[in-house]
A protein has these predicted regions:
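Nucleotide-sugar donor-binding and catalytic loop/hinge architecture
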Residues: 1, 111, 140-144, 211-223
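A short helix->loop->beta-strand "cap" motif at the edges of active sites that frequently abuts
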Residues: 143-147, 175, 193-194
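Helix-loop-beta element that forms the nucleotide-linked donor phosphate-binding surface
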Residues: 185-203
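Acidic anion/phosphate-binding donor-loop and adjacent secondary structure
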Residues: 157-162, 204-217
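A conserved active-site cap/scaffold subdomain adjacent to cofactor or substrate pockets
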Residues: 225-227
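Aromatic- and Gly/Pro-rich donor/ligand-binding loops
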Residues: 3-169
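Glycine-rich phosphate-binding "P-loop"
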Residues: 149-157, 197-207
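A short beta-strand/loop micro-motif in the catalytic core of glycosyltransferases
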Residues: 174-181
Length: 228
């Protein structure tokens, strides 16, 4: 069996620790189970106009100058952070060689038996663009494959009637459904006849020894990083 993993990971606003770690952890867990897998290098619809390296360039034209001065103080720290994140993805992830957006992904010829939509807030509809089809396995290239959600998150649940209907329809794509939060599990169950299971965040599938293998001892001392 070969598994394709799709989620928010490499492309997230504000270079999120959680986004980087959950897909890493899930891939490592599958490796431990002897399951062949690869992370799909997927650029979500809502990130196509966002510049992770130079965030101020993502602003509307009238806001760019004002936001430039806001970001000026963060320019070099953000650039350093960006490079470290990209290095993590390049060295710790096993990803597809090609970057896919929704249009390209819909035409992809994958040899996956199973697609897993994995963790993070992948089921939250964008304010203007709605749900991302890639995160619901709602693309032609994914037809005929086993489709699973693992620890998916919805975020806010105040859907319009139109989006409620769309959410119900998109859930039909999945063969198995699991959600990260209890509230999200209960909410999702209202929109499908399939059982919805509440599961652990992927980062908790590994133990301390697994993370110790990739930890880099900091040069600086006397501080504490809290990952919540």
């Amino acid at each position: 069996m070969k598994v394709g993993i799709i989620s928010i990971n490499k492309y997230s606003k504000h270079l999120n620790f959680g986004a980087a770690l959950h897909s890493y952890a899930f891939q490592q867990y599958l490796d431990k189970q002897g399951i062949d897998n690869v992370i799909i290098d997927y650029l979500p619809r809502f990130m196509k106009t966002y510049n992770m390296k130079y965030p101020f360039l993502s602003e509307q034209p009238k806001e760019k100058i004002k936001r430039f001065f806001f970001w000026l103080g963060y320019f070099f720290p953000n650039l350093t952070r960006y490079k470290k994140f990209m290095n993590f993805f390049d060295t710790k992830y096993r990803m597809t060689n090609c970057q896919y957006d929704e249009a390209l992904l819909s035409k992809a010829l994958f040899d996956f038996d199973t697609i897993v939509c994995e963790s993070d807030v992948i089921w939250s509809p964008h304010s203007t663009q709605g749900f991302d089809n890639g995160f619901f396995c709602n693309l032609p290239s994914m037809r005929g494959k086993n489709k699973i959600s693992y620890a998916a998150c919805i975020g806010y649940t105040n859907f319009s009637e139109k989006r409620q209907a769309r959410f119900r329809e998109l859930l039909k794509n999945f063969d198995s459904i699991s959600v990260r939060e209890i509230q999200g599990t209960e909410f999702t169950q209202e929109y499908t006849d399939k059982p919805v299971v509440n599961v652990l965040d992927p980062t908790l599938l590994l133990d301390a020894e697994d993370y110790a293998k990739i930890a880099v001892k900091p040069k600086e001392k006397h501080y504490l990083l809290v990952y919540n």
